[in-house]
């Protein structure tokens, strides 16, 4: 028994000494633990400075390019497609020639298919507001009365057609007579006045429902009102209630 106890004590002492030796670092295992090498990650996203410096550049096309033909004759270009050295010292109504150049981006040729940068155009010496009405278009108004005394006028803005050349501003103000139609026919109104005027059909057709009701319940004013309306419509004195002209 004593021998066994002695062996246990010796084993405990050896175990204690072995543990102390290992903990002191001299008896550490010889395995080498490889440390992972940190590889620098490449940033695949551009920095904020680079992102702001990269911008999509868009080229804005001039407005006149929409009406300027490509590879056409220079003499047929619209006025907005060329720049001409005009002067106001010409004689009104006379034919005058001006030197012109095509605007940037406009390519044109002469009659021999040769590209031209400088060319001439001929036009009548007159300002744009002096052109005949067929050479410009105006903004029409439907808020005025066509049947009035004196005849009503209104102010509007007119623009010269693209192919017409003139001096001065191509957009100008103009005073026009009130002249618009709402779709009423003079022949229809006159026919209704002759045939059904006693029932006020002509007045109802023209949009004058109050007068139409008066004629309807008075049987055309016993025929007198009917005869008067036939005369007034025939001479154009009575027209549509909206103030428009007959077709």
Swiss-Prot record:
Source taxon at top rank: Eukaryota
Cytoplasmic side: 201-215
Transmembrane segments: 180-200, 216-236
Family annotation (InterPro entries): TM2, TM2D1-3-like
Glycosylation sites (chain numbering): 87, 99, 139, 155, 169, 179
Name of the protein: TM2 domain-containing protein 3
Residue span, TM2 domain: 183-231
Protein family: Belongs to the TM2 family.
Keyword Ligase part of the UniProt annotation: no
Cellular localization per UniProt: Membrane
Annotated signal peptide: 1-30
Topology of this chain in the membrane: Multi-pass membrane protein
Record carries keyword Cell membrane: no
Extracellular side: 31-179, 237-247
GO cellular component terms listed in the entry, alphabetical order: membrane
Pfam families: TM2 (PF05154)
Keywords for the protein's UniProt record, in alphabetical order: Glycoprotein, Membrane, Signal, Transmembrane, Transmembrane helix
